[in-house]
Structures are given as structure tokens and as C-alpha cells.
């Protein structure tokens, strides 16, 4: 699927043209965009799947259970039916989470893989963000672990055959405490292999050290390794001398139990006092393209870790991976991202680059200087939408959150669930998956932002299983577990939804209908205006417009029916047509009559509990 990214200049001209009859050439260009086929126009839709959980059919779900007991999914489970089901949600990119070889409690020594110490592994299956070999994939995911890279390559090919791109994680901020690559190409030095461990910091060291002190495993009365199950390596000890700084920056030889103690911090030339040991990027580069950034770094002498991660990214691009999701990107200097991402874009200009950044003050720097394509819109949009769903804020507050990033909205990824966040259906979030219906409508249609769906979200997965490490409400990323609602859709590998309840099947159908609206030009590249709502503070209402196409979106964030009146200004009235009958592209609110008034026009509509309407007139929709 071709993703069309409208430039700000194009967007401005298309909106301006609604009132410019003398700009015939420009008007024709806009209307040409409006008549493109659905295959040519779309916003990116990312489907995040936790790879080891996706194909698991076991339903035992014993806390801290082994893969033999609780089961584990494989690359091979993503068969044609599974991939078509993912594609049917409008997916353009599949983010396969947990692909790279990370620390885990399991014995693959017959394949030359050293066992991991449970004292520095979270859960039994292990965190996907404690990577122990950047040039290898998780042996748990292979039917034949000896051919694990071949099996992943086959998955890449199958995904491409279904018209979707492949995204995997890269975690530049930290690596597993027991990092050791057995799959690295000839001549590639391992992380830390050439470090001067007598120094806390040296520019070309890959890690930071605590000279003269050995690492001590953190302890807590509330935590037992593997839930107390016996293991020959679970002895409260891990041999690391001198100790390294922990992944979240903790500098003690014995980190706290709440630190990221299973990982170690990577050194990018940031001194312990926070100053930089590398060239800074001139401010003018905020407006320069990837090639200019790439050329800037070519004659610079840079810290060793920069080159290591560049080589890792290019290695996976060569394998057919189409992009990366960067974990905790804000903990790594923006200059490094300029260096890495520009190198990636020189190899694949269409590479998809998504970063986890939570500090709004850093958003624009990581987009413009760091050359990120997309950032999480969690702090702001997600947090506000969640508060609205929990009835803690008025529905209209979503517009304040959206306005904060209006200038960069096309770079801000919208989501309601991911591996870090609570499931909508969990009691600590909304307690009912149906709350995802109005929220997904607003999240998807309010702006040019791309969308993310987490596996199981569309069938109401509630994350209630006690997998071992951590607590329910989030589907476990640390242990082997079955995902019940998702398994109902999976139907033992048929991926036909035969075991879904009527409610689950209806919810999935609704998600598909929402995501199909991403093909509307007004949604892909149109302007957004909040609409005046009378009669309820639980309804979000806005218009999206591009050229002559206008849609009106109304979503009810209440478990009670809401009757509202929407007042339209003269511009919207002119585009949508006074005294016209609107029809609903999503639900069944057809025959809504628009009536003239002194300010323009208005209409009255009754929305059922947690329902939405996406209104337009037929002529408008066809143009």
C-alpha cells in the first residue's frame, strides 16, 4: 500500500481552495487527490503484536509457567490466514515485538547459546527490551531453533506478500546485563569487548562502570526469582566485576529492585556530569533533510557505540526489515538519532522510524533534528483520552491536547493500547472493551496522525491473567501466557474468529469499519475543526475537510443515550450543503437533516451509549 504524506503546503492550498474559484489548476490538483483509489490513499496503521504470545494455543496459564507448560508462539504461526486477518484491520506495518534475541530462562545450550541467569531476568520468558544478541533472533520463536534466522526471514517475506511492512524493536539505551553476541558478523566487536573497565567513563567505552566494586543482585521481601521455583542458577548472585551502570541510569553496584537491573546503560559519549563528548548539531539542521544530516556526520570522529548501532540497523535492513521502533529514545542524545536515522534513510528512504518519547518538550527536537518519522503521543493525547473514558475530564478537553501538537500532528502516533499500557477492558482502565469504540473513532479520525492497534484490542482482551512477573491489567511481556480473547479469534490457527462471542465479533467488525475510514482523503490530509455541541459535555464532535470533502465526527463518551444539537458555521454549511440529508459512514444514523439558521446551519442527533456517527452527504462523499 502506498502511503501518501501530504505536505503542509499542499494541505494549506487544499483548504484555501474551498473558497478560491479562480485557482482552477490548483483546484484540479486537490480534486485529483480526492479521486485516488483506496489503495493509493491511507494513513499508516501499525499493528503491534507480541510475537511469542500471538500463536500460543495453550490455555493452562500457570503463573511463572514454562514454555512447555504454558506454551509459546512461533514465527510460523503467522500463516496466510493470520496475516490476512491483520491486513483486514487496515494494517500497513506490523510491529513484531520481541523478535531480537533477549535474555530468557531456558536451555538452548545445544545451539551454542549460553544460559541466562534468572537473577538478572525479569519473568521466565524475559523482557524483550533486555537484548542479549543484536544479530540474532529469539530461539523461542522458531520451530527449529537452529534455523531461527531462516524462519524469521520467511516471516518477513510472508508479511511483504500480504502488502504490509515489517517493523522490529531496537533498544539503543541499554542491553541485557549478560549481553554476548554469538551471531555477529565476522570482524564485528562485541559490546564492551574493547572497554577500559578501570574507568567509570571513557568516550569509546560501550558501558559505564563502577570501578572497584562488583555487581550485586537487588533483593526485596516482595519478590522471589521465578516465583520461588528452584533453578540451578537462581542463587542471588551474578558475576559482573566491575559493576556496570544499570539501564535506567542507576549508578550503584547494587541497584534497587525497581531499577532496570536486568540491563546495563549504553554509553553514547555523555559524560557522568551530563556534558557531551561529541559534536553537537547546528540549530539550522532542524530544517535540513536526511541527506544533509548524513553528510554532516561523515567527517566526524564519534563514540564507538554510535557505529555499533548504525551497523546493527543496517544489518536488519539488509535482511528485509522495513523499519524500527526505538525503545526509550529520549534517553539517548538527539545527535545520535540524527546520525543513525540519516544513515538508515540513505539505505532505505522509506524506512519507518517510530520512537518512544514521553517528554513533550523534546518532541520537536527528536522529529526535526533527530529525523524521527513518528513519536508516541502518550503524554497529552492518550492520557487525556483515557481520562475522558474514565469520566475524569470533559470530552472537549481532547481538543486542548490535540492543539498542543497541531504543528507536528502527522508525526504523532495515536494508540489506546500497547504492551506498556493497560488493556481498555481491564478494571483499572475502563472495565469494558466497548469504551474503545468512541475512543478509537476519535483517535483515528481527529487528525493526520497514524494509528496503532495492539493485538487482542479489537476483540476486547482484558489482560487479567496472572502470568508471574508483574501484575494483571496489562498482557504480560515477561512470561509465557495464553491470551484468551485473542485465542478465540485465532481458533487453533484458523484465524477465522469462530470461537469469538457475538459481542467480541461485533467489536472486531466495528474496529475494521473504523480503520477503513483511513482511506478518506479528508481523514488522511484534511483540516480539523471542533464543532459546537449543545446538550452534553460527554460528546466529542469535530469536522475534517479537504477540498470539497467534509465529514462530521461525533462520539458519545457516556453509557447513556445523548441527544445533542450541532451548530455548523457558514463555511462548513457551504461545503456540506444546507437543507441536506446526511448519512453515516460508520453506524446507522442516516437521514440526519441539516437546517439553516442565522449562524449557518444545525442538526439534532441522538447517539446511543458509547456510539459514534461519521456523517457526510452522498455527493460530498463521492467527490
Question: What do the PLM-derived regions correspond to, one by one?
Answer:
Residues 226-303, 314:
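Long, low-complexity, polar/charged, intrinsically disordered or flexibly structured peripheral segments
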Residues 45-47, 94-96, 166-168, 324, ...:
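Hydrophobic faces of well-ordered beta-strands that scaffold small-molecule active sites
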Residues 1-7, 12, 18-50, 54-56, ...:
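Carbohydrate-interacting/catalytic domains
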Amino acid at each position: 500500500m502506498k502511503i501518501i504524506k501530504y505536505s503542509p503546503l499542499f494541505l494549506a492550498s487544499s483548504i484555501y481552495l474551498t473558497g478560491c474559484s479562480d485557482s482552477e489548476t490548483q483546484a484540479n490538483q486537490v480534486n485529483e487527490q480526492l479521486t485516488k483509489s483506496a489503495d493509493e490513499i491511507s494513513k499508516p496503521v501499525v499493528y503491534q503484536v507480541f510475537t511469542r504470545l500471538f500463536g500460543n494455543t495453550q490455555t493452562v496459564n500457570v503463573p511463572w509457567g514454562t514454555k512447555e507448560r504454558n506454551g509459546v508462539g512461533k514465527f510460523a504461526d503467522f500463516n496466510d490466514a493470520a496475516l490476512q486477518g491483520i491486513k483486514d484491520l487496515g494494517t500497513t506495518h506490523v510491529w513484531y515485538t520481541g523478535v531480537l534475541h533477549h535474555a530468557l530462562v531456558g536451555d538452548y545450550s545445544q545451539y551454542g547459546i549460553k544460559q541466562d541467569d534468572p537473577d538478572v531476568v525479569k519473568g521466565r520468558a524475559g523482557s524483550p527490551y533486555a537484548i542479549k544478541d543484536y544479530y540474532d533472533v529469539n530461539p523461542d520463536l522458531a520451530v527449529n531453533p537452529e534455523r531461527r534466522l531462516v524462519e524469521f526471514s520467511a516471516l518477513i517475506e510472508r508479511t511483504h506478500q500480504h502488502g504490509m511492512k515489517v517493523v522490529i524493536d531496537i533498544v539503543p539505551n541499554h542491553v541485557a546485563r549478560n549481553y554476548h553476541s554469538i551471531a555477529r558478523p565476522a570482524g564485528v566487536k562485541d559490546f564492551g569487548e574493547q572497554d577500559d573497565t578501570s574507568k567509570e567513563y571513557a568516550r569509546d567505552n560501550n558501558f559505564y562502570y563502577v570501578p572497584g566494586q562488583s555487581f550485586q543482585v537487588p533483593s526485596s521481601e516482595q519478590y522471589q526469582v521465578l516465583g520461588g521455583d528452584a533453578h540451578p542458577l537462581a542463587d542471588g548472585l551474578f558475576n559482573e566485576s566491575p559493576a556496570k551502570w544499570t539501564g535506567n541510569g542507576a549508578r550503584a553496584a547494587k541497584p534497587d529492585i525497581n531499577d532496570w537491573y536486568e540491563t546495563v546503560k549504553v554509553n553514547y559519549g555523555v559524560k557522568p556530569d551530563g556534558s557531551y563528548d561529541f559534536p553537537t548539531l547546528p540549530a539550522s539542521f532542524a530544517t535540513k533533510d536526511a541527506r544533509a544530516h548524513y553528510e554532516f556526520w561523515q567527517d566526524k570522529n564519534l563514540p564507538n557505540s554510535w557505529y555499533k548501532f548504525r551497523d546493527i540497523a543496517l544489518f536488519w535492513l539488509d535482511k528485509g526489515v522495513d523499519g524500527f521502533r526505538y525503545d526509550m529514545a529520549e534517553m539517548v542524545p538527539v545527535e545520535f538519532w540524527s546520525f543513525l536515522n540519516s544513515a538508515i534513510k540513505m539505505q532505505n528512504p522509506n524506512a519507518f522510524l517510530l520512537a518512544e518519547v514521553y517528554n513533550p518538550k523534546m518532541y520537536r527536537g527528536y522529529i526535526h533534528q533527530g529525523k524521527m518519522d513518528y513519536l508516541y503521543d502518550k503524554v497529552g493525547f492518550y492520557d487525556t483520552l483515557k481520562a475522558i473514558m474514565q469520566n475524569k475530564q470533559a470530552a472537549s478537553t481532547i481538543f486542548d491536547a490535540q492543539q498542543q501538537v497541531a504543528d507536528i500532528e502527522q508525526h504523532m502516533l495515536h494508540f489506546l493500547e500497547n504492551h506498556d499500557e493497560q488493556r481498555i477492558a481491564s478494571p483499572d482502565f475502563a472495565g469494558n472493551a466497548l469504551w474503545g469504540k468512541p475512543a478509537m473513532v476519535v483517535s483515528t479520525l481527529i487528525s493526520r496522525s497514524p494509528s496503532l492497534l495492539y493485538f487482542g484490542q479489537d476483540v476486547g482482551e482484558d489482560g487479567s491473567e496472572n502470568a508471574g512477573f508483574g501484575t494483571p491489567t496489562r498482557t504480560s511481556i515477561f512470561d509465557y501466557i495464553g491470551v484468551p480473547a485473542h485465542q478465540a479469534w485465532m481458533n487453533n490457527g484458523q484465524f477465522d474468529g469462530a470461537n469469538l462471542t457475538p459481542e467480541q465479533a461485533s467489536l472486531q467488525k466495528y474496529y475494521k469499519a473504523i480503520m477503513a475510514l483511513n482511506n478518506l482523503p479528508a481523514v488522511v490530509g484534511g483540516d480539523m475543526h471542533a464543532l459546537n455541541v449543545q446538550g452534553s459535555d460527554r460528546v466529542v464532535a469535530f469536522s475534517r475537510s479537504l477540498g470539497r470533502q467534509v465529514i462530521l465526527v461525533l462520539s458519545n463518551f457516556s453509557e447513556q443515550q445523548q441527544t445533542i444539537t450541532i451548530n455548523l458555521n457558514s463555511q462548513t454549511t457551504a461545503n456540506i450543503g444546507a437543507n441536506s440529508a446526511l448519512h453515516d459512514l460508520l453506524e446507522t444514523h442516516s437521514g440526519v437533516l441539516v437546517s439553516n439558521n442565522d449562524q449557518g446551519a444545525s442538526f439534532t442527533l441522538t447517539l446511543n451509549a458509547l456510539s459514534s456517527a461519521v456523517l457526510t452527504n452522498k455527493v460530498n462523499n463521492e467527490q
